[in-house]
């Protein structure tokens, strides 16, 4: 996730909460990343010019994890807005393909976590903990 440093406005980002039963998938951002290094984050990335957010999400999951997800039919699960980026977070619980770390230049690990594991993680955004805990409780 690259953050805008010019006056072009906030970068538009899509991310996914991937669920597998009572586990959620997180990606560990490499320590050398300029923005949000060495933290656990949701998979996703930029919405390209003219691209629908749902299409962006499907593309990003293919690029980062090697999976094919259906476009979400529901509205975003959560949104984070800052002066530098606007992030839409979508719930994904069905996909095809074998999940791998296909973006090793961005993430040095991908892993599944249960609710009890989340509190000890350095997460990219403070709202992730309550959001993920609530999702896993349902």
For the regions a protein language model found, what residue spans apply to each?
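Conserved Nudix-box catalytic region and its N-terminal flanking loop in Nudix hydrolases
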Residues: 23-63
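Short, charged/polar surface micro-motifs in flexible loops or helix N-caps
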Residues: 19-24, 31-33, 48, 83, ...
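Acidic pyrophosphate-coordinating catalytic loop
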Residues: 5-9, 32-35, 78-89
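A generic structural signal for short hydrophobic patches within well-formed alpha-helices
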Residues: 47, 118-119
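Active-site-adjacent beta-strand/loop module that shapes the phosphate/pyrophosphate-binding cleft
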Residues: 69, 78-100, 109-111, 115-117, ...
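Conserved N-terminal beta-strand and adjoining loop/helix that marks the start
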Residues: 2-25
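Short secondary-structure junctions
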Residues: 65-71
């Amino acid at each position: 996730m690259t953050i805008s440093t010019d006056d072009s406005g906030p970068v538009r980002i899509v991310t996914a909460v991937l669920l597998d039963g009572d586990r959620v998938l997180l990606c560990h951002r490499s320590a050398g990343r300029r923005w949000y290094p060495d933290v656990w984050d949701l998979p996703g990335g930029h919405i390209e010019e003219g691209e629908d957010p749902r299409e962006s999400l499907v593309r990003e999951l293919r690029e980062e994890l090697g999976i094919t997800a259906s476009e979400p039919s529901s509205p975003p699960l959560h949104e984070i807005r800052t002066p530098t980026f606007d992030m839409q977070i979508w719930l994904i619980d069905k996909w095809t393909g074998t999940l791998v770390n296909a973006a090793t230049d961005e993430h040095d690990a991908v892993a599944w976590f249960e609710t009890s594991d989340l509190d000890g993680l350095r997460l990219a955004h403070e709202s992730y903990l309550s959001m993920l805990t609530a999702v896993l409780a349902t």
